[in-house]
Amino acid sequence: MHFSIPETESRSGDSGGSAYVAYNIHVNGVLHCRVRYSQLLGLREQLRKEYGANVLPAFPPKKLFSLTPAEVEQRREQLEKYMQAVRQDPLLGSSETFNSFLRRAQQETQQVPTEEVSLEVLLSNGQKVLVNVLTSDQTEDVLEAVAAKLDLPDDLIGYFSLFLVREKEDGAFSFVRKLQEFELPYVSVTSLRSQEYKIVLRKSYWDSAYDDDVMENRVGLNLLYAQTVSDIERGWILVTKEQHRQLKSLQEKVSKKEFLRLAQTLRHYGYLRFDACVADFPEKDCPVVVSAGNSELSLQLRLPGQQLREGSFRVTRMRCWRVTSSVPLPSGSTSSPGRGRGEVRLELAFEYLMSKDRLQWVTITSPQAIMMSICLQSMVDELMVKKSGGSIRKMLRRRVGGTLRRSDSQQAVKSPPLLESPDATRESMVKLSSKLSAVSLRGIGSPGTDASASDVHGNFAFEGIGDEDL
């Protein structure tokens, strides 16, 4: 996740109190919460007591007198670096102290009282699931509530996640982000104040081998089936006419497992597809459609002759990647804290091993660049878990201080309608992919600047590449 503090505000205290400076914390370019310096100082003290001062990043010191505008800007930059460093630290960033602070701050900023509400969660096929939750319930609480409503077993909950999406006019989903442990889903979706934004349940893993675990259960099987049919209908999974005929026959027979077995062999099965964007590969300002899955990023582009081409970039051949953001200022203006800021431009850049001795940077410019980066990192994490012989099943945190009463009614996952005929142009897809090797890193840049070498962090997945891999 990309944390930033792009702006500050001068606000009046409660009941006419003295004015203070508020720091607006953004996550992936969207306002998450508004906090005072004293609140962040309190968070630092809590982390220091719990983990010790040695592990904490540098924090801007207190000042005896009121800050000048230049000092406010300097403190903003220092606090931004502090929040980014804490979030990227495996220990601090995953701590309940840090995450609960962000949840409380989000709720306070949006002024949402704690109360029981009905929250709508969509399945991949558009089916609605209504769950009773508290406005203060975190992401895992809501995920558990959805699983309970669907009768999905506890040991399969970790195979699914909640995603914030924007529903487009044609009914397709544009992925905004995967909901995280530091946010409150009800507050996150309602604070956007638009009916376009929805919460969707999808599987959270990339390796189709894990499908076997999910398919053992009736509800898990239905969820995978519904997602796969939906992805095929949207053109996210590439299907030839003959494959489409076989799938339709299996669907008519309600042979869900056989349907999924065939779907697993199809190109882009289990991928997330992003909105059309621009890349500098194979040439500058090239319009592409990016998909993530199966340990790779796929870039589809249409050549002048209307033929579709695809370039596949294996995550294990990416030496590093970074996300950078820039905010263009109006022509002739100068930088001023919190003023004159335009729309944020996001870029994902990765250094790719094109051949044994040749590395090349590939840059994708997209509002969804951070989501793409998160997908890359989760694919690396999954590869490392599998390499170490681990499992993606996880122990779920249980509520402290009581449970929220859930409805006992169950909602079956309906079978989707029969598949429509595939687009004939999909058969002209030509794949340009590379063999597997093993390199991966991650990094993220500061707002308004290019990432420097210090922004790129190592990953234990590095194994090198040999002649046989090329």
From Swiss-Prot:
Ranges for region FERM-like: 115-432
GO biological process, one term: intracellular protein transport
InterPro entries, sorted: PH-like_dom_sf, PX_dom, PX_dom_sf, RA_dom, SNX17-31_FERM_F1, SNX17-31_FERM_F2, SNX17/31_FERM, SNX17_FERM-like_dom
Superkingdom of origin organism: Eukaryota
Broad class of where this protein is predominantly found: cytoplasm
GO molecular function annotations of the record: phosphatidylinositol binding
SUPFAM superfamilies assigned to the protein according to its UniProt record, in alphabetical order: PX domain (SSF64268)
Topological type in the membrane: Peripheral membrane protein
Domain PX: 1-109
Entry's Gene Ontology cellular component terms: cytoplasmic vesicle; cytoplasmic vesicle membrane; cytosol; early endosome; endosome
UniProt KW Transport keyword: yes
Subcellular location: Cytoplasm; Early endosome; Cytoplasmic vesicle membrane
Residues in Ras-associating domain copies: 115-206
Stretches for region PTB-like F3 module: 270-432
Alphabetical UniProt keywords: Cytoplasm, Cytoplasmic vesicle, Endosome, Lipid-binding, Membrane, Phosphoprotein, Protein transport, Transport
Region of interest (Disordered), ranges: 400-425
Binding positions (a 1,2-diacyl-sn-glycero-3-phospho-(1D-myo-inositol-3-phosphate)): R36, S38, K62, R75
Modification sites for Phosphoserine: S336, S407, S409, S415, S421, S437, S440
Complexes and interactors: Monomer. Interacts with APP (via cytoplasmic YXNPXY motif). Interacts with KIF1B. Interacts with the C-termini of P-selectin, PTC, LDLR, VLDLR, LRP1 and LRP8. Interacts with KRIT1 (via N-terminus). Interacts with HRAS. Interacts with ITGB1 and ITGB5 (via NPxY motif). Interacts with CCDC22 and CCDC93; the interaction associates SNX17 with the CCC complex. Interacts (via C-terminus) with VPS26C and VPS35L; the interactions are direct and associate SNX17 with the retriever complex.
Family the entry assigns: Belongs to the sorting nexin family.
Entry function: Critical regulator of endosomal recycling of numerous surface proteins, including integrins, signaling receptor and channels. Binds to NPxY sequences in the cytoplasmic tails of target cargos. Associates with retriever and CCC complexes to prevent lysosomal degradation and promote cell surface recycling of numerous cargos such as integrins ITGB1, ITGB5 and their associated alpha subunits. Also required for maintenance of normal cell surface levels of APP and LRP1. Interacts with membranes containing phosphatidylinositol 3-phosphate (PtdIns(3P)).
Protein name: Sorting nexin-17
Species: Pongo abelii
